[in-house]
Amino acid sequence: MSYEKVLQAGKIVIGTKQTIRALKEGKAAEVIVAEDADLPIIEKVMAAANEANVPITKVDSMKKLGKACKIQVGAAAVAILR
């Protein structure tokens, strides 16, 4: 289900740094994180999302999340922008 959200989203940012930046700037409407990503990376993104009061959705695979973003590599985090 969340993979479809990414596919249908108008604007997204891909990657932990860009996701955290979007959260700090108040541009993220929702954050999607891959559960198979490194825990310290996920924790940073989730902490930023909680601080910004943005909903977090977890998916099982970085590879599938990357594919949903139409990139050839895995993605640990994606932000759907407002």
Swiss-Prot record:
Pfam families per record: Ribosomal_L7Ae
InterPro entries, A to Z: Ribosomal_eL30-like_sf, Ribosomal_eL8/eL30/eS12/Gad45, RNA_bf_YbxF-like
Listed SUPFAM superfamilies: L30e-like
Organism for this UniProt entry: Geobacillus thermodenitrificans (strain NG80-2)
Family: Belongs to the eukaryotic ribosomal protein eL8 family.
Superkingdom of origin organism: Bacteria
UniProt protein name: RNA-binding protein GTNG_0100
Keywords: RNA-binding
Keyword RNA-binding tagged: yes
GO MF annotation terms: RNA binding
